[in-house]
């Protein structure tokens, strides 16, 4: 399945979201002079997020992070006496969901509107060695001058879950012209 871009708009904001990694790719708003600027650092084109170079970079620009955001020491944890060994992808640690975390998955569209979008993903039992099937829903909604992100996760086994997003906001676009976008 090919990733799709959805555009949310209201009077103050325009937000572009890719189904690849539930990634925020652009956030357009007016600066103090009334000029429309993109305040997210990201790749130039949506398809650049699929390039081998970007994937190998470990940048996570604007993407959802999961099943577990941050590091798990040595990729190990224990729940109810059962030991789990996750993939090691950051020195000796497990980072941001592993080698093929939620940032690399194509998400399904649950609902799409002009100012809101709901994406869903089902992470099967054993994916990246995590226990339990995990049903995830992330909702994006524009509210005046804000982007709201809501997360919902339900699992059928005990498991750690720590979802987050990884956007980089640039409030001075002139300072980094040509760096990413």
What feature does the model see in each segment?
Residues 1-181:
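Surface-exposed acidic/polar loop and edge beta-strand patches at domain peripheries
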